[in-house]
């Protein structure tokens, strides 16, 4: 039937030949001749090259391993985010940013038809180039001729399982979770608690920014088109991998340092990562909105390292970064490293023996091999889900806004752009019953197509809770009856008491000394005595309030609780370089990198009755937040939020907060259903008692030895043992004869330095991907 419907040419048999090109891990290839299957009538096939450029789906037929295989490909419409930009520099160093209208139609993903476990990442720009799997076998395909025509010869590389060779190791087997100690007052990325708690069901969007250094520019003969094609193919592969986690990786921008490197890049991967992190945090946010940035470098890192990233820092303004060495001509090996380092940003550990990998090798395997990673292990999936429970992850749930998109709107690309109400893809792809796929408009008679306040294509009633309060410093958000979207997240007014009076709310958080001690030193830590904090009046590096250049400013008497953080107990295994200083019952940390305020009391911390720390000063709450009696100015059942705006209490409809019909309706429902539930429960108990009596009577009868049916035994639920991450080993060096500053009493010092040298930053822990291979 398929043959009758499609215009097909016969395939020549594949001809095995000896390898004439040398690729990492590949000894030989065979020649195949992919034939494109055209689903059009002959009279419609007039300009195949032009038609292919715009087709959403493609099929290619070829002989693979002696059998006919049909490769189904679907265009990756989200490879480039709307508003994609490219930045380069002219000979004078002037920055030039463009928004090229790139037709990324030649980048596809798909699978082999009728194969249960199969996937593919293919570029059709100049023949077929990329990866696909068939069963347990992985293949790489690329054209042998520069001439693009149907049926041209391609090299098909087969990766032999017997050639698998773990000749590389990773030095970060014992990575610890590290909490972000950046200023908690920053509300840009706030913890997301999904209502149903099932992160897997929600689509995530990673806005991906790639920077290529000057060495890369020269490595590819200063040919920006060649670099672009290579980068797009790598990004396409990374996107294919993360789609398995219901996550879209869209390239929002690419930057090439065409004149010179903007940072100091050295073989020391940690040093390079730290420099790139600082450059990214100070330069990129003003240029382009993005969630993560990676540097691709031609510099060979020292030892076996080919990649490095901070641990569990996705969405962080400075540390959501990674550096990757362009270590192989095989771009998919480099793409695998890019995906691996991104995994560390999501808090994924390296896979160990207890992890279940559904493919030959998974993304977070600790070593590079001849295989390209094709999936995530069970451990990686658990770590990924945990990231969304514990970390700041808002940036991954916000798809680009229509007003942020500067490219020409295209209906059917699954991105809502200017002039569109919705975009559910093509008519074949669309599953949204509220959206007209042909016009990208809401269907007649409907009000909305999606959102927390949209139900069955209609707005939910005003006052219905769409985002419950997460904690005592948060406020619930209610639908307004005019939109399908839930309003922006709002918090309690800054200065609202929390943690049983131990703190005051600030931007949705409740900063306390105890919380900060636990974050720094781990469980079992407690806040040190007041006498320890009095040392902040000394103005030494073991007790001060502020740092101005290299000068340490002592605390005033009233501000001692707002300077250096002093704690008791806890662990001495810290992930940062520096000195652990202990005297009497006081313990503090002196970081090697003074640019980050590790070990200082955070803004918003309570320092007295109705007083909080702001910029190392203990000030009145009213002076700090100007929120006193704010709620008294709100009308109806409303309270003040963190921006001193009035917001309705739960169950009261905006904007006036005087309509409780939602609460009244709920009360009626409860009043009706409660008696019904009670009656149902009583009936169930009576029936159960009667059944029990009948069963007892039957049990008293003699048992027959014939004609009995075996009872099906209920399986006992198996206990799943949780696998704990290995503890990080640390090299500890005791230093005894350190000079004592001023009248400081003798103190014991402990230099905390991981055996793997991470960048000296606060919360994030760096994690590397190592390759002992000669750089391929």
UniProtKB/Swiss-Prot annotation:
- List the glycosylation sites: 268, 275, 352, 558, 603, 629
**Positions with a binding annotation for Zn(2+):** 170, 340, 344, 350
Enzyme class, broadest EC rank:
hydrolase
CDD domains, from UniProt?
ZnMc_adamalysin_II_like (cd04269)
For the Extracellular compartment, the record's topological domain ranges are: 194-666
Q: Which UniProt keywords apply?
A: Disulfide bond, EGF-like domain, Glycoprotein, Hydrolase, Membrane, Metal-binding, Metalloprotease, Protease, Signal, Transmembrane, Transmembrane helix, Zinc, Zymogen
Compositional bias ranges of the Basic and acidic residues kind: 691-701
* GO molecular function ontology, one term from the record: metal ion binding
Cofactor note (record): Binds 1 zinc ion per subunit.
Q: Which residues lie on this side of the membrane: Cytoplasmic?
A: 688-776
Q: Which residues form a coiled coil?
A: none
Residue ranges annotated for the EGF-like domain, each copy included: 626-658
- Domain Peptidase M12B: from-to ranges: 204-400
- Tell me what PTMs the record reports for this protein: Pro-domain removal and maturation may be, at least in part, autocatalytic.
GO CC field:
plasma membrane
Hey, what's the signal peptide range on this chain?
1-19
SUPFAM superfamilies, alphabetized? Blood coagulation inhibitor (disintegrin), Metalloproteases ('zincins'), catalytic domain
Protein's UniProt keywords contain Transit peptide: no
Short motif (Cysteine switch): ranges: 168-175
NAD listed as a keyword: no
Please give the Gene3D superfamilies that the UniProt record associates with this protein: Collagenase (Catalytic Domain) (3.40.390.10), Disintegrin domain (4.10.70.10)
Alphabetized Pfam families for the sequence:
ADAM_CR, Disintegrin, Pep_M12B_propep, Reprolysin
* Catalytic site positions: 341
PANTHER family from the entry? ADAM A DISINTEGRIN AND METALLOPROTEASE DOMAIN (PTHR11905), DISINTEGRIN AND METALLOPROTEINASE DOMAIN-CONTAINING PROTEIN 28 (PTHR11905:SF32)
Domain note: The conserved cysteine present in the cysteine-switch motif binds the catalytic zinc ion, thus inhibiting the enzyme. The dissociation of the cysteine from the zinc ion upon the activation-peptide release activates the enzyme.
Question: Know the name of this protein?
Answer: Disintegrin and metalloproteinase domain-containing protein 28
User: Which organism is this entry from?
Assistant: Macaca fascicularis (Crab-eating macaque)
UniProt lists the gene as ADAM28
């Amino acid at each position: 039937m398929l043959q009758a419907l499609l215009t097909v040419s016969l395939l020549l048999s594949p001809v095995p030949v000896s390898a004439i090109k040398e690729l990492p891990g590949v000894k030989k290839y065979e020649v195949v001749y992919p034939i494109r299957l055209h689903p059009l009538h002959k009279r419609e096939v007039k300009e195949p090259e032009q038609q292919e450029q715009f087709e959403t789906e493609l099929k290619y037929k070829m002989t693979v391993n002696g059998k006919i295989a049909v490769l189904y490909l679907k265009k990756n419409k989200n490879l480039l985010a709307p508003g994609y930009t490219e930045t380069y520099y002219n000979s004078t160093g002037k920055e030039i940013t463009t928004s090229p209208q790139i037709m990324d139609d030649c980048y596809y993903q798909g699978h082999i038809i009728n194969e249960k476990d199969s996937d593919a990442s293919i570029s059709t720009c100049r023949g077929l180039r990329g990866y696909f799997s068939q069963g347990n076998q992985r293949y790489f395909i690329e054209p042998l001729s520069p001439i693009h025509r149907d049926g041209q010869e391609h090299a098909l590389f087969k990766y032999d399982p017997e050639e698998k060779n773990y000749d590389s190791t990773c030095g970060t087997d014992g990575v610890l979770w590290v909490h972000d100690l950046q200023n908690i007052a920053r509300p840009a990325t706030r913890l997301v608690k999904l209502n149903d708690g099932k992160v897997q069901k929600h689509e995530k969007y990673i806005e991906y920014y790639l920077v290529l250094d000057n060495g890369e520019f020269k490595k590819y003969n200063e040919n920006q088109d060649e670099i672009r094609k290579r980068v797009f193919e790598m990004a396409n592969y990374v996107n294919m991998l993360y789609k398995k986690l219901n996550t879209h990786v869209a390239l929002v921008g690419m930057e090439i340092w065409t004149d010179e490197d903007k940072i100091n890049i050295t073989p020391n991967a940690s040093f390079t990562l730290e420099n790139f992190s600082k450059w990214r945090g100070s330069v990129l946010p003003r240029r382009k909105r993005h969630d993560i940035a990676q540097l691709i470098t031609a510099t060979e890192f020292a030892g076996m390292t080919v990649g490095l990233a901070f641990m569990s820092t996705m969405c962080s303004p400075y540390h959501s970064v990674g550096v990757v060495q362009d270590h192989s001509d095989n771009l998919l090996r480099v793409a695998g490293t890019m995906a691996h380092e991104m995994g560390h940003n999501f808090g994924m550990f390296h896979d160990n023996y207890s992890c279940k990998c559904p493919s030959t090798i998974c993304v977070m395997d600790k070593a590079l091999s001849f295989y390209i990673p094709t999936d995530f292990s069970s451990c990686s999936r658990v770590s990924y889900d945990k990231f969304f429970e514990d970390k700041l992850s808002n940036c991954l749930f916000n798809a680009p806004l229509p007003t942020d998109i500067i490219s020409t709107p295209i209906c059917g690309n699954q991105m809502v752009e200017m002039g569109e109400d919705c975009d559910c893809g093509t008519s074949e792809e669309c599953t949204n019953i509220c959206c007209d796929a042909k016009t990208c408009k809401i269907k007649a008679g409907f009000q909305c197509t999606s959102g927390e306040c949209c139900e069955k294509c209609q707005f939910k009633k005003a006052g219905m809770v769409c985002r419950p309060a997460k904690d005592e410093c948060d406020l619930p958000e209610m639908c307004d009856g005019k939109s399908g979207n839930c309003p922006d997240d709002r918090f309690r007014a800054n200065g609202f008491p929390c943690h049983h009076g131990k703190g005051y709310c600030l931007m949705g958080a409740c900063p306390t000394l105890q919380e900060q001690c636990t974050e720094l030193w781990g469980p079992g830590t407690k806040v040190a005595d007041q006498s320890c904090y009095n040392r902040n009046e000394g103005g030494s590096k073991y007790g001060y309030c502020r740092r101005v250049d290299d000068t340490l400013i002592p605390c005033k008497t009233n501000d001692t609780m707002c300077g250096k953080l002093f704690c008791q107990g806890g662990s001495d295994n810290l992930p940062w370089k520096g000195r652990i200083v202990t005297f009497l019952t006081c313990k503090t940390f002196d970081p090697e990198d003074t640019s980050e305020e590790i070990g200082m009391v955070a803004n918003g911390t309570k320092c007295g009755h109705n007083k909080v720390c702001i910029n190392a000063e203990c000030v009145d709450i009213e002076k700090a937040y100007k929120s006193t009696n704010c709620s008294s100015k709100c009308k109806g059942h409303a309270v003040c939020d963190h921006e001193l705006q009035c917001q309705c209490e739960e169950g009261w409809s905006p904007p006036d907060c005087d309509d409780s019909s939602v609460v009244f309706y709920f009360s009626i429902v409860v009043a009706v259903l409660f008696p019904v539930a009670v009656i149902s429960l009583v009936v169930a108990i009576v029936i159960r008692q009667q059944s029990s009596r009948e069963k007892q009577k039957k049990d008293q009868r003699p048992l027959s030895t014939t004609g009995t049916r075996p009872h099906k035994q209920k399986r006992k639920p198996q206990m799943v043992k949780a696998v704990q991450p290995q503890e990080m080993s640390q090299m500890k060096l005791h230093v005894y004869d350190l000079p004592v500053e001023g009248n400081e009493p003798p103190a014991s010092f402990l230099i905390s330095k991981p055996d793997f040298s991470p960048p000296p930053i606060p919360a994030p822990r760096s994690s590397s991907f190592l390759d002992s291979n000669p750089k391929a």
